[in-house]
Amino acid sequence: MEWIVFGVASFLATYLLMPPFIRLMEKHKLLDSSGGRKIHTGYTAHMGGVVIFVASLVSVLLGIFIMDYADLTWKALAFITLMSLVLLVGVRDDMNNLTPKIKLICEIAVGFLLCYIGVRIHSFYGLFGIDVIPVWLSYILSIAFMVVVSNAYNLIDGIDGQAGTQALSFFCFMFAIFMFVFKDTNTLSVEDNFANTSFWLLVAVAMIGSLLGFLVFNWQPAKIFMGDTGSLFIGFLLAICMLVMMDYNGENTKTICSLEIKSNLLVVIMLFFLPLADTLRVFIYRVQRGKSPFSADKTHIHHLFFRIGYKHSKIALTTLSIQVVISLISIAMAFVLEDIFYIIYIIGMWFVFVFGLRAFTRSRIRKLRIKK
């Protein structure tokens, strides 16, 4: 019951803070203009990620104070401080457009500090026959993972409602998993872990509430965008939560309905499948055409759906539905498939996604041409 209170608190904080924040952005002309690859028209306030962060932080701190977590260590406070730094990098980028190089350096630096406080993958838990990995390799893989996930999330923030709904899907699944699977697991075997189930439940429910509040103002026609401020902060938080869940899941000894999870690490990645799969698809597409994988174009999934006549709200709901269905299927498959077969399943799902998307959009384009 208490989790509902904290979720409602973050929702109300976002809902109440957003209107004055929008007016502040409009007053100081901190607006996102249309043109280029952008689908929206006119000028729209951005940096909505600031309100999402503040609202979720208020909820988390409220939870810590009310529930009096004696086992909440300095790591949680260090984590909040580092997430504040990520937010500031995003604000700076929204206001002055940081160069990709500077932005990457900032991401790596924050990633390193997060690894230092224990937010990293410590073991492969039997994947490829590997268990505990060297610290230096753990740092490299974890930082790379944070950079990839945060940038993949940033790349899907192209239409009203899509980035918010994708993050909402992940945090809902995360909350359910921590609540029903990891609730009584507050210690892990690795020494420098970040094992505090109650803290991560607070993070998940706070983000669910603040994202719902944000979507009220970000739904088509959007009154505000989350901006790089939001996409960088939320993208990093998604990566962090995935790394934490990998450690919890790797050491999980519980069964659900007498069934044991056989693929511990890879199932976590599938909760964020669509952004990662679409980013890989677009990068390969660009390379095949002799372009840099980082060059800008209009080939992301939301661009394709927009091309066949879908409105922002329909695109957001369609991509959300795809992600939810894939998450449910992937969780079910984790009870059936060992790691090696789960890898084959992931590769197969990517091909189904790529060729299914291509066939669907081409079919709709042909129908539109016939009508004309």
Model segments located where?
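Membrane interface segments of multi-pass transport proteins and intramembrane proteases
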Residues: D94, F124-I133, Y310
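Juxtamembrane helix-capping/reentrant segments at transmembrane boundaries
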Residues: S33-H46
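Membrane-interfacial loop-to-helix junctions in multi-pass transporters
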Residues: V132-S142, S198-L202, S263
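Alpha-helical transmembrane segments
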Residues: M1-K29, F53-L88, A163-K372
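Membrane-embedded alpha-helical core segments of multi-pass
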Residues: T81-V89, C106-I121, L141-N151, A167-F173, ...
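Membrane-interface helix caps and helix-loop-helix hairpins in membrane proteins
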Residues: Y69-A70, V91-L98, F128, N154-D160, ...
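A generic, lipid-embedded transmembrane alpha helix
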Residues: A45-F65, F112-I117
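Short acidic, Gly/Ser-rich segments with clustered Asp/Glu that frequently serve as metal-coordination loops
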Residues: N96, V148-F170, S231-L232
